[in-house]
């Protein structure tokens, strides 16, 4: 028996572990392990949980319709998920496990524990890197060290992609028939525990089908204008695919391949190259997170900035959280985040700089607040963005760089 272990890759397309597992002719089953306690420990937003759980429901139906069973277990936290997986493997007679690698520190520790236990039982584990375009340890400077400046990383990243010329992951050889969705009620019960406002559920569309349709519409209608429109929060100039990429309902490779042909179009080239650059940023922050695991413990990338003295003014922090600073653009952005689970990237930078460089409040408090509300919450990107804005991170903005958030003769006051 072969097992496909789904994690943050809730899709059937562009999924190498699924394709490889089904290529061998052996029986295949699939598994996802819920870890609500780990979500609590990581401060994952209810909006993101809602998006993931609904995407999981769609995945279970899609797999079953193609003849593959999906089992959903409750592991509690990552330690519990190791035991749940070990027991499931023994009960089902699994001899091989196929999964995509995950790179944050806690996930790495979980997977190392899984490898020790399963390999001791003679179970083989096959890991793949569908969560990125370039694996975190693939690129190095001339000195053999990780890239810590994005511009240099991007040049090497482009060379890698040009040389590789990746193609789409082949479609799985589905067994046919009707599979089972075992544990659907666990997912539904988990959804019942969430309190997510209608302003979030009306805006976001979980699942692989929605993600693929949204990608198609963006590439056909907006990709060419992306560079010109992306920096204006009042315009719908972004792809809106961040939640899909975060939950893995869309493969980064599929996003890249959809945009790549536009690089040969004189009118669309700049927009395509700029958007592909955002996929490179995503890989960059993942390799930073992977190569510098202390970031997962709350450490700044630049050690000297650990000496910074931050303000502990709770009144100012709450005003920022609630959109009551008196700076209209900052307040509008923060209210957008709370009400919709999302904020335009330019506004993420602006509000982060406002908190850290106007109010002198620790970036980690802002980082946690964002994660508690973002539907696209992603540790690598969120941590990287906050440290960049606070000038504590890799390739960081200069300490004196502050985004202009308000222009007026009279400075407003926090109330």
Language-model segments: residues:
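Alpha-helical scaffolds flanking conserved acidic
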Residues: 270-275, 345-350, 365
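Trp/Phe/Arg-rich N-terminal binding region typifying the photolyase-homology
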Residues: 1-164, 335, 381
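Secondary-structure transition/capping motifs at alpha-helix termini
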Residues: 120, 262-268, 295, 340-343, ...
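C-terminal substrate/ligand-recognition segments
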Residues: 286, 321-361
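Aromatic-anchored, charged helix-turn/loop surface patch used as a conserved interaction hotspot
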Residues: 59, 282, 286-330
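Glycine/tryptophan-enriched, flexible segments
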Residues: 123, 144-300, 409
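Single conserved hydrophobic/aromatic residue that forms the stacking wall/gate
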Residues: 408-415
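Active/binding-pocket-proximal capping segment
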Residues: 296, 302-307, 349-394
